[in-house]
Swiss-Prot record:
Disulphides: C36-C77, C46-C61, C62-C104, C75-C113
Glycosylated residues in this chain: N93, N137, N165
Recorded topology in the membrane: Lipid-anchor; GPI-anchor
Gene expressing this chain: LTPG13
MF (Gene Ontology): lipid binding
Alphabetical list of Pfam families matching this protein: LTP_2
InterPro entries: Bifun_inhib/LTP/seed_sf, Bifunc_inhib/LTP/seed_store, LTSS, Plant_nsLTP
Propeptide position ranges: 178-205
Compartmental location: Cell membrane
SMART domains referenced in this protein's UniProt entry, alphabetically: AAI (SM00499)
Function per UniProt: Probable lipid transfer protein.
Organism this protein belongs to: Arabidopsis thaliana (Mouse-ear cress)
Protein known as: Non-specific lipid transfer protein GPI-anchored 13
Single GO BP term: lipid transport
Length: 205
């Protein structure tokens, strides 16, 4: 009984993650959904941790994270890019999310995300990744034991030209046109509909 409830809730979380990927993909919705759905379902159990609701990630979360990093890092980049989209109603603690690879003993370089997402290195979207990585490195360095050499971190940073004062802080970039905004609003309605379906199944179970 309890196992079935957990599976239902994990499926609901996975639906949100998949929706995030589909929205970020734009014209390549079908292709990106096909590539990322399985990996994101595997990471569904990470959501309680990166939202600050769990003290540590589950073994399944770490396994799913490593699979995404090894098979398609682009999917992880999309999750980071869309982490604060208000239309999706999904809030992620950036510090916990970026520290997740280290906690799971995995290696992930988010400074590669702009290239994987085909972003201009000097664009605001790209600068978000560079500054988040820089902020993580500074946090790790500050927490290193005194008198001992700090271990190399899995995140590296590239200096940006337009976001030098936003290190480690959450940054959101507004949409470029009305069509993109309408698309996100429609996607939000779809996610809500999915939740009602999952909630109904959850009650029946």
């Amino acid at each position: 009984m309890e196992s079935r409830k957990i599976k239902v809730m994990a499926t609901a979380i996975a639906l949100i993650m998949v929706a995030m990927v589909v929205d970020a993909a734009g014209a390549d919705k079908g292709k990106d959904k096909e590539e990322c759905t399985a990996q994101l379902v595997g990471m569904a159990t990470c959501l309680p941790y990166v939202q600050g609701k769990a003290k540590s990630p589950t073994p399944d979360c770490c396994s799913g994270l490593k699979q995404v990093i090894n098979s398609d890092m682009k999917c992880l980049c999309m999750i980071i890019q869309e982490r604060n989209d208000p239309d999706l109603g999904l809030q992620v603690n950036v510090s916990l999310a970026l520290a997740l690879p280290s906690v799971c003993h995995a290696t992930a370089d988010i400074t590669k995300c702009p290239a994987l997402l085909h972003l201009d290195p000097n664009s605001p979207d790209a600068q978000v990744f560079y500054q988040l990585a820089k902020g993580l490195n500074e946090t790790v360095s500050a927490s290193a034991p005194t008198g001992s050499a700090s271990e190399p971190t899995s995140m590296s940073s590239t200096p940006g030209s337009s976001a030098g004062n936003n290190s480690g802080r959450t940054t959101s970039v507004p949409g470029t046109n009305h069509a993109q905004s309408f698309s996100k609003q429609w996607l939000g309605l779809e996610v809500v509909a999915h939740f009602f379906v999952i909630f109904y199944i959850f009650i029946l179970v």
